[in-house]
Amino acid sequence: MAKKAEQVVPEIIDSVEGLNAKMAAMREAQKVFATYTQEQVDKIFFAAASAANKMRIPLAKMAVEETGMGIVEDKVIKNNYAAEYIYNAYKNTKTVGVIEEDKEYGIKKIAEPIGLVAAVIPTTNPTSTAIFKTSSAGSMFHLLT
């Protein structure tokens, strides 16, 4: 018999102390993430985009149920677009280590995480916006809060 997938319940942070603790944990995770190679980041980026796209229908249904706004089918399209477009737009972009070098002038551009990135998620498009922002940040080597 097929095993029913566990539903993940989002953690609600309802205090400044809780937010500070979560951000401290994310900063520690960022230190580990900052050591990853381009290949590791690319693998995570692909897995995240694939997971978001796989969940496009359930996420669309949840968004409409929770907000009372929108049409499920339209949100499915937006979720699919957010997951696939960002992945395809950035999948061949170097985001780790030396990303550009001008040997004539001795200049190197080196990509490195800037830290945590905060983002506002609107009620009107909660899932597609979250997919878009986390994919963008993740592909560029950042963690989104």
Language model region names:
Residues 93-145:
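Conserved small-residue-rich beta-alpha loop and adjacent elements
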Residues 1-108:
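N-terminal Rossmann-like NAD(P)+-binding subdomain of aldehyde/semialdehyde dehydrogenases
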